[in-house]
Amino acid sequence: MAKEVWRFIDSGYCPPAFNMALDEALLDWHSEGKIPPTVRFYGWNPPTLSIGYFQKVEKEIDLEAVKRHGLGFVRRPTGGRGVLHDKELTYSVIVSESHPAMPKTVTEAYRVISQGILEGFRYLGLDAYFAVPKTEEEKADLRSPRSAVCFDAPSWYELVVEGRKIAGSAQTRQKGVILQHGSILLDLDEELLFSLFKYPNERVKERLQRDFKKKAVAINELTSRTVTIEEAKEAFYKGFEKGLNIVLEPYTLTAEERAYVEELARAKYESDEWNFKR
């Protein structure tokens, strides 16, 4: 049987508002039947702190530190916690909830989509596997995360190598369409990451940072040689094809599509109302 063809977009390094606007536009276009299911790869220029849809900026984020380090800042349309997007490959997958390969529940759909990432890690020679919380304590951690930092704990079907989280993802469902996007870390600047959040006191910050080192890891901490972004793209391109049993067909946005995304970025994702509303 012929494999299903999905669209593939590598949008390169883009401003934070554009990145979120393009993910939203792809969701909209797919819901309207204008485009097939899509896998997208992207990066961030400048490096950016993104926060989850429900996070409270004033309570959790040190905006002065974000400015001081010259970082971008944007609120995602998906849940989850704060992510520093810097030395990473960011991906998004846009597919209809009614797609025959998509299970009905969020966690099971998450597992199916993330199979593409799992295979990508294997192409890089890393033995990744899915973290499934077993104990009641681990399940409780998912319901009430200890910190505003995303990689603080593996969630359902998060990808783990040698017991440490290596890719963080979030999902939203709108208009009958699943949007899952996430970060595949090549390198991680923990000092910078932890300087961007507010803490009750320095002791709490130090403890969280110490715990974090035991729970999160980047690709280049695990490999004997440095994996480049181009190598990562190739591995995860093949990974998504294998994991989702699809063929990816590269696509470039038209001038009209790009203009639509830029307008959405300006009107919504660059606005204070969106980014600071909670």
Curated annotation (Swiss-Prot):
GO terms for molecular function: lipoyl(octanoyl) transferase activity. SUPFAM superfamilies: Class II aaRS and biotin synthetases. It comes from Geobacillus kaustophilus (strain HTA426). It catalyses: octanoyl-[ACP] + L-lysyl-[protein] = N(6)-octanoyl-L-lysyl-[protein] + holo-[ACP] + H(+). The lineage of its organism: Bacteria, Bacillati, Bacillota, Bacilli, Bacillales. Keywords: Acyltransferase, Transferase. Belongs to the octanoyltransferase LipM family. It comes from the Bacteria. GO terms for biological process: lipoate biosynthetic process; protein modification process. HAMAP family: LipM. Coiled coil: none annotated. The active site is at C150. Its EC number is 2.3.1.181. It holds the Pfam family LplA-B_cat. The record marks K165 as: Lowers pKa of active site Cys. It is an enzyme of class 2 (transferase). In the reaction, the free carboxyl group of octanoic acid is attached via an amide linkage to the epsilon-amino group of a specific lysine residue of lipoyl domains of lipoate-dependent enzymes. The reaction proceeds via an octanoyl-thioester enzyme intermediate. Residues 33-248 form the BPL/LPL catalytic domain. PROSITE patterns: BPL_LPL_CATALYTIC (PS51733). Catalyzes the transfer of endogenously produced octanoic acid from octanoyl-acyl-carrier-protein onto the lipoyl domain of GcvH, an intermediate carrier during protein lipoylation. InterPro entries: aa-tRNA-synth_II/BPL/LPL, BPL_LPL_catalytic, LipM, Octanoyltrans_LipM/LipL. Pathway: Protein modification; protein lipoylation via endogenous pathway; protein N(6)-(lipoyl)lysine from octanoyl-[acyl-carrier-protein]. Monomer. This is Octanoyltransferase LipM. The keyword Transferase applies.
